[in-house]
Amino acid sequence: MLHGVLLIALFSCAAFYIGEMSFVRSISFSPMIVGIILGMLYANSLRNHLPETWVPGIQFCSKKILRIGIILYGFRLTFQDVMAIGLPAMLIDVIIVAVTICGGIYLGKLLKMDRGIALLTSIGSGICGAAAILGAESTIKAKPYKTAVSVSTVVIFGTISMFLYPFLYRNGFCALTPDQMGIYTGATLHEVAHVVGAGDAMGNGISDSAIIVKMIRVMMLVPVLLITTYLVARARKRQVQKGQKFQKIAVPWFAIGFMGVIAFNSFDLLPAQLVAGINTLDTFLLTMAMTALGTETSIDKFRKAGAKPFVLALLLYVWLVVGGYFLVKYLTPYLM
């Protein structure tokens, strides 16, 4: 198993190095995104030459290390951040997350697409991109290629928004105040990295509020995973009643750990440098998980998924950009 873990760690080191390149930084591709790309390149070139004894190590990275990474992600948040941003941003976040996930599941049914991919794509679009998809993947036990397909859609449309929002704001197409633009950016962009990139391009006043609003969405991962677990358990119970084989339910204890870490971090007991070091370690662990998932994803599996995941992601993207804009513009004035 050790060989597989070391292989993924090596790829993750490469992802960190590439992520520091000026071009990669300019498009705000996090090491996690670079990692899954490297993993997919490996899957479609040298994967067949991998010794079978290395596979358990790769699976360990995509499951166990993933959960540790999600728990440590809590060191990026405090409950004080949530209180500072106020009721309007929290309400907008709740609406965005609820409509995106529920709407995505419904659209997935209309498109007659794979339920797992529809759920992962919806959660990724609604909450925090790749990290949310990884958390949900661990809960519903989706196949690695489904996770990779969902992550790909999030990366594509999130990257488009990262360049689109600053362009629209600078050229006067967004009739929003700086506070509203911060809420709009944080509530509708997919990845944390996308929010950071877009916020920096529009100024510190927007960037700071956008990041906090985004982090509130990240915190919503916990209730979403718990609700998902409950619904999956109910669905599998019905399958057993119909005579089908029982499938074990994965209780997302790591989500509880994530919230516990947020609570601990809210007391500000650790030095800032130590927290920064933990966050760097956490990014590396999540990069290992993403890379491991990428190594299980071949082009053939993308072909198997078809165009429907991208159609769903596009529809959700239109909702986030257009629906999110009108929510922020017309709802926040009544709440502030």
From Swiss-Prot:
Membrane topology type: Multi-pass membrane protein
InterPro entries with a match to the protein in the record: UPF0324_pro, UPF0324_YeiH-like
A Pfam family the protein falls into: Cons_hypoth698
Keyword RNA-binding: no
UniProtKB keywords: Cell membrane, Membrane, Transmembrane, Transmembrane helix
Compartment annotation: Cell membrane
Transmembrane listed as a keyword: yes
Domain of life assignment: Bacteria
Similarity comment: Belongs to the UPF0324 family.
NCBIfam families, per the entry: YeiH family putative sulfate export transporter
Protein name stated in the entry: UPF0324 membrane protein BT_1919
Species name: Bacteroides thetaiotaomicron (strain ATCC 29148 / DSM 2079 / JCM 5827 / CCUG 10774 / NCTC 10582 / VPI-5482 / E50)
